[in-house]
Amino acid sequence: MFFPKSSLRPGVAPREVFGWAAFDFANSGYTTVVLTAVYNAYFVNVVAGNASWATLLWTVIIAVSSAIGMVVMPVIGTLADAHAKKRSGLFIATVVCIAATFGLTLTGEGTIVWAALMIVLSNLAFNIGETLNSAFLPEIASDEGVGKVSGWGWSFGYCGGLVTLGLSLLLVTFGPELWGLDFDGSVAGTLWITGIVFAVATVPTFAWLKERAVPKPDAPRAAALFSDSMASLKKTASALPQLKHFGRLTLTGFLNQCGVSVVITLSAVYATAVMGFTLNDSILLVFLVNITAAVGAFGFGYVEDKIGHKKSLMLTLWIWVAMIVVAATSEGVVQFWIAANLAGIAMGSSQSAGRAMVAVLSPAARSAEFYGFWNMALWFANIVGPLTYGAVTWVSGNNHRLAIAITGLFFLAAIVVLKTLDMEEGRREALAFEKKVGWERAPVKPVRLP
């Protein structure tokens, strides 16, 4: 992968950026297999026995893991900033996510409690790892190239999802004939593949990605960490009046993620319930959508730096709206595949744009803290979005079309909020805030913003 020097900060080697992007490659298999293509539908239809409350229960489990993340992430964000422990925290989160993914191989019909525990642990660890890895972005990317580098990470991540899904598709297609695997065995096999790919692909991350932060002399210890992190979170929130455009971005990200989280966690459930998809169909669908997503994330990374992050994000939000309309009205497989590929284009590009915009609108010296705040908002969205979908299916007698249509309201609301965001003014707010509190970053070239 080629990384132009102009897109990187001084002293950052291309292989370090490759190591950073390798983590996106590694962990994408978890979301595609566990949350999107395989295990979510397996939980609803097998573990929970396709009960009327099964979809709602799945969304509750996802909500619980997100709620825990909202509580612990401020602690982890403060720890990462104060003790310069982003890299160590990233390693621990990786190990926990892989171990819990392997734990899911022990689930089956009726094992609701164990499955719920493993999902909560793995999803929590995944989100923590995603947050800590994102916090490295301002350290390795130049201000002019942050969109490109973020896009590289997302596109490389979708390539990782393709590798994991491709191997999983081969297993479920040929496994029954070659090794006599039944349905449960095929699902377990995809989980083993996911964990192994995750472990192997993170080797470049921990070999090459550097911790550039310096521990603060007055860094809090474990006993005082929670109270200090709560104070830090309060301080972050209290800074929002001075960083109003970061606040608007956070609200936009929350509304966008409400819809995105539904697509991630319930797409296979929707495809199975409404379109009659099999396990092979679902994996193939997500596999091809990941190709679209990789192209979208990579291409939009360059589009962002050409037309600006805000316009890029606005474009992807309208693509999400179009996807919802097509999916909710799909009567045939072709129409549904069109909706799925629209989701793929929007998925990587909207998340890449949001991550890049945080780097522009937040104080660089407190990057992990503000990324933690940003991700806390996204985790809250991971509660609200899926729970809304699950509640609608429950009260409407499993009307998944109605549930996906209501999901579209989140994207429309995000568009309304995004219209009020000004990137130039927001950038000035961030730099003025750094100067006011005495945390000025090293001199950089002027940033061209929309």
Where are the regions a protein language model picked out?
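Glycine-rich segments within core transmembrane alpha-helices of 12-TM secondary carriers
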Residues: 151-172, 375-386
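A membrane-interface helix-boundary motif in multi-pass transporters
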Residues: 51-53, 172-196, 391-411
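Structural signature of the two symmetry-related core transmembrane helices
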Residues: 88-103, 311-326
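Hydrophobic core of transmembrane alpha-helices in multi-pass small-molecule transporters
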Residues: 100, 111-129, 335-349
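Juxtamembrane intracellular "pre-TM" segments in multi-pass secondary transporters
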Residues: 2-17, 210-251, 436-450
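Short amphipathic helix-loop junctions that connect adjacent transmembrane helices
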Residues: 32-55, 265-282
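Multi-pass alpha-helical transporter architecture, strongest
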Residues: 2, 197-208, 405-443, 448-449
